[in-house]
Amino acid sequence: MTDRIARVERTTKESSITVELNLDGTGIVDVSTGVPFFDHMLTALGSHASFDLTVHAKGDIEIEAHHTVEDTSIVLGQALGQALGDKKGIRRFGDAFIPMDETLAHASVDVSGRPYCVHTGEPEHLLHSVIGGYPGVPYATVINRHVFESIALNARIALHVRVLYGRDQHHITEAEFKAVARALREAVEPDPRVTGVPSTKGSL
């Protein structure tokens, strides 16, 4: 299996993003987006997926975090898709249940080449909650869905994320990110019994 690494850069009038990703890493993570809670979530994602992940982002956070979070998620998805390459020899499917105190979240991944995202189960108060920002730039949890959609669509994977139950917005969001991390880790792992692309069609 060839090196599964990627480096993607994206610059717009709203942000400048660089992501470096190694799917066969050991969880070495260096993240700086200017949004402390998002840094915390991306660090959890890389660590629990055992990816080596570097994210450097500069955006118009003086307006709010939305553009930076959105654009970083797009570039992360692009890097994931690029690092996957021809997808030969991978498990393809992965899923994980992650508890965090009162919260339980679940994620399922299919490295299918058919981009899709389902995000469900978050309590309604997460539409209006913010985390952090005292000091620092706050993270509005309403963007959780958009983060996962952006990763899935740009990586060309099917990603389902659901919250089975929970109350605390921090616990819910963190459990979701960790569930996605563990599901991705399983899905992209090499399977010694798979010699080609894991599809009856012969391609993904």
Curated annotation (Swiss-Prot):
Q: What is its EC number?
A: 4.2.1.19
User: SUPFAM superfamilies, per this entry?
Assistant: Ribosomal protein S5 domain 2-like
Q: What is the lineage of its organism?
A: Bacteria, Bacillati, Actinomycetota, Actinomycetes, Mycobacteriales
One GO MF term, please?
imidazoleglycerol-phosphate dehydratase activity
Give the main EC class: lyase
The record's CDD domains line, in alphabetical order, gives: IGPD
| Tagged with keyword DNA repair | no
Q: Which gene encodes it?
A: hisB
InterPro entries referenced in this protein's UniProt entry, alphabetically: IGPD_sf (IPR038494), ImidazoleglycerolP_deHydtase (IPR000807), ImidazoleglycerP_deHydtase_CS (IPR020565), Ribosomal_Su5_D2-typ_SF (IPR020568)
| Cellular localization per UniProt | Cytoplasm
In its UniProt entry, the species of origin is given as: Rhodococcus jostii (strain RHA1)
Its pathway is: Amino-acid biosynthesis; L-histidine biosynthesis; L-histidine from 5-phospho-alpha-D-ribose 1-diphosphate: step 6/9
Question: What UniProt keywords apply to this chain's record, in alphabetical order?
Answer: Amino-acid biosynthesis, Cytoplasm, Histidine biosynthesis, Lyase
Q: Which cysteines are joined by disulfide bonds?
A: none
Q: What is its main location?
A: cytoplasm
GO terms for CC? cytoplasm
Which Gene Ontology BP annotations are present? L-histidine biosynthetic process
Reaction(s) catalysed (UniProt annotation): D-erythro-1-(imidazol-4-yl)glycerol 3-phosphate = 3-(imidazol-4-yl)-2-oxopropyl phosphate + H2O
Instruction: Give the family this protein belongs to, as stated in its UniProt record.
Output: Belongs to the imidazoleglycerol-phosphate dehydratase family.
Q: What is this protein called?
A: Imidazoleglycerol-phosphate dehydratase
